[in-house]
């Protein structure tokens, strides 16, 4: 699903290659402390695989931050550069065929991130994660309607999963209360 190579802009304005493994390793080591401090992935999850997937996707999301920070905005249209050439027609964006690749990468990460927290315990923690990553979703280079719609759908689905989680917990509480009351009634009848 992910590309082995991703294009980013260097300081000189040209295109340079950065391997996905280097991005992932850099994100993992430089953002590990922030991941643990934000408590994005709860270790009290009822599914260890879900916790691992959450950490994995969160690390890839942090790698997007690294990609965005490595990109330098290009000169405005019509302004001469040091070489005397006109600036790029697109400011701060990848050139040519590079943008669809990064766009697809971000869209895939968004879907993977939203689908990794659908268990009962993790869905209760999903909204805090959304709030902490709201700035990232608002500053993606792929600022398309498709990403916005998919993000809204994932929020709606997580809200439904969150409500189902609460209903299940309430039902379990009601059943436990009924069991306690029935046992107490049985003890009262037997004692009398």
From Swiss-Prot:
UniProt protein name: Putative uncharacterized membrane protein YER148W-A
Membrane topology summary: Multi-pass membrane protein
Alphabetical keyword list: Membrane, Signal-anchor, Transmembrane, Transmembrane helix
Other information: Partially overlaps PEA2.
One Gene Ontology term, aspect cellular component: membrane
Transmembrane domains' residue ranges: 7-29, 51-67
Intracellular or extracellular location(s): Membrane
Species for this entry: Saccharomyces cerevisiae (strain ATCC 204508 / S288c) (Baker's yeast)
Domain of life: Eukaryota
Main location as per UniProt: membrane
Keyword hit for Transmembrane helix: yes
